[in-house]
């Protein structure tokens, strides 16, 4: 998939003035780090955007704690760029970004999700759920920085599930990518009712490497950049 993307004329074409310096915070998926979005970062930078990593490690921590960290990164990137920023998240990173956008719409210009099961994060592949639950057992043994049982059955789970079920504020437009070929996050669970939903033909992990993703994303991001205000909106 990577060679195909690198050969694609739409991906290789550089338009350094298109983004106008609009910031984009990149949030990786469960079990992946910031380097998993390095090609997206390069594509954004070549078009005049200012991408920044979320710096949440491998995205295996407590949901509420990770949203707190994403919020702080949003604040930093808004301060750095002087205006609201776009959140672009893959899989779990997408719905974590949605939680942060719902909490702080004053910081978010738009939201892009790739294979993010916002309608039911626990409705993903049983294999992934088993891996996540294994982390809670390690957490119970004292290993820090991991999901815990509260993220599955306690206040953390219930609070964040309710937030995901709520509509996004009108000031935060959203674009949700999903694939019927996705064997990790079912296509139906990625249909965010607050977003413009777009279908592409891709596996779950290769979605951010698909030329169609960039072809569809480009005009949307450019429109957000062109119409953006230069300062964060009031809460």
Identify the residue ranges that each predicted region occupies.
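Serine-dependent carboxylesterase/thioesterase catalytic core
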Residues: 22-30, 35, 39, 45-54, ...
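Generic hydrophobic, helix-prone segments enriched in Leu/Val/Ile
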Residues: 1-6, 70, 131-132, 187
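Glycine-rich phosphate/ribose-binding loops and adjacent secondary-structure elements
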Residues: 59
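Flexible, membrane-associating and regulatory peripheral segments of lipid-active enzymes
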Residues: 1-25, 32-42, 47, 230-235
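Short, flexible hinge/linker loops that cap or flank conserved catalytic cores
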Residues: 16-19, 79, 168
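Helical cap/lid subdomain of alpha/beta-hydrolase-fold lipid enzymes
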Residues: 102-103, 109-235
């Amino acid at each position: 998939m990577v060679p195909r993307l690198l050969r694609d004329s739409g991906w290789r074409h550089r338009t350094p003035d298109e983004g106008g310096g609009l910031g984009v915070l990149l949030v990786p998926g469960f079990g992946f780090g910031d380097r998993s979005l390095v090609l997206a970062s390069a594509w954004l930078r070549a078009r005049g955007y200012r991408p920044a990593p979320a710096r949440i490690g491998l995205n295996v921590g407590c949901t509420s704690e990770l949203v707190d960290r994403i919020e702080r990164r949003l604040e930093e990137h808004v301060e750095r760029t002087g205006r609201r920023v776009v959140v672009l998240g893959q899989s779990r990173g997408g719905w974590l970004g949605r939680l942060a956008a719902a909490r702080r719409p004053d910081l978010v210009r738009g939201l892009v999700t790739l294979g993010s099961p916002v309608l039911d994060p626990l409705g993903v592949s049983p294999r992934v759920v088993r891996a996540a639950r294994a982390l809670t057992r390690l957490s119970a043994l004292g290993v820090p920085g991991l999901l815990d049982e509260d993220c599955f059955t306690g206040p953390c789970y219930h609070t964040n599930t309710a937030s995901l079920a709520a509509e996004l504020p009108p000031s935060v437009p959203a674009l949700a990518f999903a694939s019927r070929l996705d064997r990790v996050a079912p296509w139906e669970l990625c249909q965010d009712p607050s977003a413009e939903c777009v279908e592409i033909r891709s596996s779950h992990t290769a979605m951010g490497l698909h030329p169609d993703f960039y072809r569809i994303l480009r005009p949307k991001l450019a429109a957000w950049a062109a119409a953006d205000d230069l300062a964060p909106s009031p809460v």
